[in-house]
């Protein structure tokens, strides 16, 4: 496991059932300085997610959020996603950023530190 204090930043993956929910979550967490930036992917056509839920194969159109943040904000970010999200079990997958442009990494840090 990677130690979070050694990470430059994190990218968090969250899927949403529609554009409105995705944009509401994105705007809220950026405004609250829990994220520096959120990319809303699949706005026009969505993306297809295939998974098993309640023992049935599901195929749903979803919107993907790519959330850029710092490791120290992950617990609060996860709690906020839980509060805002309509899914009973929202996706919350953290990808470590171990290398990135120095000025961009600093921008992420500065953006979430101002809150």
Residue spans for each PLM region:
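Positively charged, small/polar-rich N-terminal and surface patches that mediate targeting and assembly
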Residues: 1-115
């Amino acid at each position: 496991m990677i130690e979070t204090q050694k990470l430059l930043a994190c990218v968090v993956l969250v899927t949403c059932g529609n554009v409105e929910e995705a944009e509401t979550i994105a705007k809220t967490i950026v405004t609250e300085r829990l994220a520096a930036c959120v990319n809303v992917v699949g706005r026009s056509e969505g993306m297809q997610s295939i998974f098993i839920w309640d023992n049935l194969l599901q195929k749903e159109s979803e919107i993907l959020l790519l959330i850029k943040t710092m490791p120290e904000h992950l617990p609060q970010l996860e709690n906020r996603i839980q509060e805002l999200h309509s899914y009973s079990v929202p996706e919350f997958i953290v990808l470590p950023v171990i290398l990135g442009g120095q000025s961009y990494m600093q921008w992420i840090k500065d953006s979430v530190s101002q809150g």
